[in-house]
Structure formats: structure tokens, C-alpha cells
């Protein structure tokens, strides 16, 4: 009875209750406009490592030896994956902002480990001592971000001479490759150059037919001074005159004309 009376009053006076629930219950305005309380369980920031500037000192500390001993940092690490076959690639990164993924990789789980080209003891743990090949990421379990940093740091350490690597020695063979194949041997001269003939056939002298010569003689009769013959073997050399002599001859020419 009381609920029906309340519903009638709410219908007749709608301006008193602008917000009503599903069952005609008035909702206070303050409840809808208040902000959510701040989250108290926010993640704390990642602490700064004391070995950030000198990361090689951490591998000589007592804390590191108590944690890992003489084994590599990835020796006891096991990946979490679905199924019996692990994926061929590890995760992209373990730390995104302040959020750390579950079961982080061997480097990301220890905040005092820093990948640096001067940290030779750490880099040697990810390089095969017999072949000098860098271990793959699925073998060590590091994420792809740290694996990329390790590859760059190892290459930089080798360039600076901090990390030794094997260079295979190749003995020269007895076979001389410069004459064993036509593609790498010396190019032989052209047959025409060996015989002394010109490179192109139209450069060589060809005697015109006698019928054509007689026709030209009749056509240019009285204008021919000498008959044509084969070209000389070498062009005559013109003596070079000094610039002083050339100017003197040019000056003497107009004077003689006058």
C-alpha cells in the first residue's frame, strides 16, 4: 500500500525526482557525479639498479654468486607455454612500462643485470665457447628485446677487442683459378687484331670495280688530277711550330703582302 502511494506521488510530481530507478526508487544526484576513488593498489615504480653505470661489478659481487653460482643466468630458467612443443620465438618483451610479465626472462627478472658491451662476463654466457656462435633466444629463454640487445653488445665488444672470436684460416689451393675458367682468365685479343686487319671490315681498303672507275673517268674528264689509290699506312706527321714562330709568320705575311 505504501509503495503504491509513493508511485502515485512520483508520477504526479516528476520534477521532484528526475532520476528514478527501475522500481521507482529515487537515486541521489551525488551518487552519479562522484569520481571513482583513487586506486591504492597501483604498481610501484621499478627501482633503479646501483650497477647501472658499472654493470660488470655485479657479476663479481657476493649476491650474484649466491643466486647463480658459477652457472649461466639462464641455466635454471624454464619457459611457460601451452602444449608440449614450445614456440619457436620467445615473447617480444617482459617489461612494458611498470608492468612485468609473469615468469620474466633470465635478464629481465634480475633488475641488476644490464646488457652492456663492457660486461664481458655476461656476454660470454650467451656465446658458444667452441664455435663462437650466439645462442638462439629459444635456447636461453631471453625475450626478443633482450636478445637483440645481446647481439648488438656482443658485436660491439668484438669490434672493441673486448670479446675474442674465432676467424677460420683458409689455406690457399694449388689450383690457379685465374686460368682455370674462361670467365676469370685474361681476355684473348680479337682474331682481326692478331692478323693485322682492321676491327670492322668496312675500314679495310677495297679496290673498286674497273667498270665503275671508267665511268667516273668519263664523267669527270678534265677535272681529275691523279687517280685514287689505297690509303697510306700512316698519316704524315705535321711538325709542331712554337707559338712565337707562329706569331712571327702571321706578322710577316701581311707585311709581305703590303
Curated annotation (Swiss-Prot):
The modification Phosphoserine is found at residue 49. GO terms for molecular function: structural constituent of ribosome. Residues 1-35 form a transit peptide. GO terms for biological process: mitochondrial translation. Residues 244-258 have a biased composition (Polar residues). It is found in: Mitochondrion. Pfam families: Ribosomal_S18. The keyword Transport does not apply. Keywords: Mitochondrion, Phosphoprotein, Ribonucleoprotein, Ribosomal protein, Transit peptide. Residues 221-258 are annotated as: Disordered. It comes from the Eukaryota. GO terms for cellular component: mitochondrial inner membrane; mitochondrial small ribosomal subunit; mitochondrion. The keyword tRNA-binding does not apply. Disulfide bonds: none annotated. Component of the mitochondrial ribosome small subunit (28S) which comprises a 12S rRNA and about 30 distinct proteins. Belongs to the bacterial ribosomal protein bS18 family. Mitochondrion-specific ribosomal protein mS40 subfamily. This is Small ribosomal subunit protein mS40.
